[in-house]
A protein has these predicted regions:
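ABC family nucleotide-binding domain
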Residues: 2-215
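Conserved beta-strand-loop-alpha-helix hinge in the C-terminal portion
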Residues: 219-229
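Short, Lys/Arg-enriched, disordered terminal segments
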Residues: 1-2, 229
Length: 229
């Protein structure tokens, strides 16, 4: 199967108080198109930093990152932003909804950035899929945590991304709401045929993916393929 994400010899080093802090150390892996991958590990293991590098939110100190055929290493910030807008969707632990926009307007943002047509109708269709059509004109402060994450899901899938990155998507939700969000995430992902990369502490969420990469101290310590039906 063709790889949509290739990580080769990637390291990330920060300068702190005159010393070097190695957050990622010579990371190597590829992600097959259409697959689902979980990246797990304790806090400070480097998994969120790795996710940011994979998405082009930051530059690696060394190594090569290729996303959907585009090598990110030498691109400017504006060029990386254009790649993200074209190929990538995001789901965040803290939802990251714009507080001055309604649920509908939040979902419309990526579509507007791409200059898509029939923006409002498409955004409403996605809100309907996540069960929030009747809350489309509510602002984030008027929505529960679970509802905000459902808006975030609709927004993430709005531009039909080739690759979706989810950083602790259930981290701020209770167990019952988390299960609903997980089911919705995988249902939407299956319908869209999107490649899904999740950073999570939740072993049940990780077990639902095709593959689990475990990290510790900036290193990959295991690369597993859990069974999930």
């Amino acid at each position: 199967m063709e790889s949509i994400l290739n990580i080769r010899n990637v390291s990330k080093i920060y300068q702190s108080a005159g010393r070097e802090l190695t957050v990622l150390n010579n990371i190597n892996f590829s992600v097959s198109s259409g697959s689902t991958l979980a990246i797990t590990g304790p806090s400070g293991s480097g998994k969120t930093t790795l996710l940011g590098l994979c998405a082009g939110l930051d530059r690696a100190s060394s190594g090569t990152i290729e996303l959907n055929g585009v090598v990110l290493d030498q691109l400017s910030e504006d060029e990386r932003a254009a790649v993200r807008n074209r190929y990538v969707g995001f789901i965040f632990q803290n939802f990251q909804l714009l507080p001055t926009l309604t649920a509908l307007e939040n979902v419309m943002v990526p579509l507007e950035l791409r200059g898509a047509k029939n923006i409002k109708a498409h955004a409403m269709e996605l809100l309907d899929k996540v069960g929030l059509a009747d809350r489309s004109h509510h602002y984030p402060v008027q929505l529960s945590g679970g509802e905000q994450q459902r808006v975030s899901l609709a927004r993430a899938f709005s531009n039909t991304p080739a690759l979706l990155f989810a950083d602790e998507p259930t981290g701020n939700l209770d167990a019952e709401t988390s299960e609903k969000i997980i089911k919705l995430l995988f249902d939407l992902n299956k319908d869209a045929g999107t490649t899904l990369v999740i950073v999570t502490h939740d072993p049940e969420l990780a077990a639902r993916t095709n593959r689990v990469i475990k990290m510790k101290g900036g290193l990959i310590i295991a690369d597993e393929n859990p069974s999930y039906v």
